[in-house]
């Protein structure tokens, strides 16, 4: 069945147990888009000849040029299973037709926020791993993201053709290679074991691992071969599957199975995987590549594969492609694995509801989500915005978790800051149209029931990046997505021609809509600042801004890194500030927090929204806090979730609760703009020791308390030997031995240091991991390629904040220079103010 109509899609959408929502995730350049091609080609959207190099899902021109996926794209495919396959289904299904909603996501680490957006709306993931390179840093990151969202993985070991043609390794070596890759994936999976999700490990003999060559368009699972042999020898398929992987050997002479490589008489047995699966493949490769055509055709007739007369004329790799594609079509193997081993929305939403929904688990929305019920109140999570062909408008791309969405329906559009019962961040508007996403095209569709992925027209003006759409008045939001990267590289953008300013402002709004991880801000001096996850991410964002969103020439400053201000020891004396009317006093000290706790707050392990008793317990047990202190945390900052806290250590202060709001507001302000150069504070703990307040309420209003609290935060920070923290990238480089020297010289020049290097077993490649300050990372990729003659490919991921040595208050030191430059750029006074500016005498 080739081109299927929206009506047929609509029919399948109504059977949630026959829908599969899945994303394709992997390390950069392991072949996601190429593999996706085979699946798309099965659905008849591109021709078989093009599959493997069309990269249909890379819809943008710059994606085709660079050969790297930038945005995640969705497409709906149709799969038919045979009755025989249906017997192995883990869950009940309705008929043999399946709808697979597939999202191809980028692998490059700068775009991992796109991956997060894709994972949120899917229930299963196809993890692609390169046979030769194995599990890399980004494979691990995306797997961790997937398991954190409770998404079930299946694995494809890709690029098998490279192992056969380039490395020419023996069958046993190839088996060992596969076994190693599968094992290292399982190690990552078992690290993030989740009781509710159960065991997610993958095994070739269970059918959850496929071996493929995306470029040549062929793939197989152990199950497919077991099927073949089960028919031939008349034995049970599932028994055969277990025999075809692991330590199972077969002796062709005696026709006996054994568990060891040699039998009692010393005859050697052959590993079943090598003999029954790899042998036919090796033979075909051998015969085709050494152009022994007659041998090829006898092999094909034995394997019951027929090819067309005109295809018999082909030579070399072209013939190999055709033969392997006919023998082991990639789409069949992958579709079978997706349908049999990934959960349907009906199953998945039962265990994902609690990680998706913020409200109580027994209100009507939560129940609707859990049952994936098309008649419940509508709940849609919009995970990102997709630009339309019509300039400046966006489709909202998301998933219906419960209810049914149709054109013209009035919905409540809740942004990420919406609180039930309040009116902030809430719009009530009608949806203009609902559409199906098909790669670069869209198909209009009447309505869309729970469990499906959908595009909406007409809500883009009311949402920035993501949000919840619902028809229920009591609905809470769906949880906000946690991104694994943070925007640390910023540039200032100006227009060349003053009249274009409104266009720039409008363009920045659109840019921040279209990319989940970009941050556009306006500083107090009126600069427009764009922040991104890394050099490549920023480059693409600015290109989009100039060409699509704003459409005007821009002046772009050299990139600037964002720093954090922190303290290195407790305040040398207690800081005191008096209010402007001299009637109120606040006493405070600052001290550093442990790095572990700061990271725990940033990753959400210690959460400001948790119950304070639970949180206090965690902080006391894991981070050695005093329980009473941990219970009396007033707030986190900046943005109520940052890694700084205010602790109330006062004893018996009258009217204290009345000023709590003012202090929290002041702290939010102070922690966003630190005293040294107006960067965010990080990992500081502020203790309020004592507060003296005026008895008369009119003399202790917000106007008196807020400036005072802010000054006392600044004073206590400057008294606690302040330091600055710079962001550090984790660099992973894969390189052959002869280019190692070049890497070390480039890293040493840029203040980087290598902390691990290991050789990949069975290959001449080394894996090098190093830390590199973000400040030094500009142009790093280019220099590295020069030094290693283009052999090394670095992956840079933001890893942690590291304190810089040197006193930032001394203008001659390195941190001091950074502070001075930043102050000049922001239009502040040259020198850092002394603590006495904020400190009042008793």
From Swiss-Prot:
The protein's name: Elongation factor 2
Binding site for GTP: 26-33, 104-108, 158-161
SMART domains the UniProt entry points to: EFG_C (SM00838), EFG_IV (SM00889)
Record-stated family: Belongs to the TRAFAC class translation factor GTPase superfamily. Classic translation factor GTPase family. EF-G/EF-2 subfamily.
GO cellular component terms attached to this protein's record: cytoplasm; cytosol; ribonucleoprotein complex
Modified residues (Phosphothreonine): 574
Name of the gene: eft201
Compartments where located: Cytoplasm
Phosphoserine: residues carrying this PTM: 568
Pfam families in alphabetical order: EFG_C, EFG_III, EFG_IV, GTP_EFTU, GTP_EFTU_D2
Molecular-function GO terms, alphabetical: GTP binding; GTPase activity; ribosome binding; translation elongation factor activity
Keywords of this entry: Cytoplasm, Elongation factor, GTP-binding, Nucleotide-binding, Phosphoprotein, Protein biosynthesis
Any Gene Ontology biological process: translational elongation
Domain tr-type G: 17-253
Its job: Catalyzes the GTP-dependent ribosomal translocation step during translation elongation. During this step, the ribosome changes from the pre-translocational (PRE) to the post-translocational (POST) state as the newly formed A-site-bound peptidyl-tRNA and P-site-bound deacylated tRNA move to the P and E sites, respectively. Catalyzes the coordinated movement of the two tRNA molecules, the mRNA and conformational changes in the ribosome.
Modified residues (Diphthamide): 699
Protein's UniProt keywords contain Ribonucleoprotein: no
InterPro entries: EFG_II, EFG_III/V, EFG_V-like, EFTu-like_2, G_TR_CS, P-loop_NTPase, Ribosomal_Su5_D2-typ_SF, Ribsml_uS5_D2-typ_fold_subgr
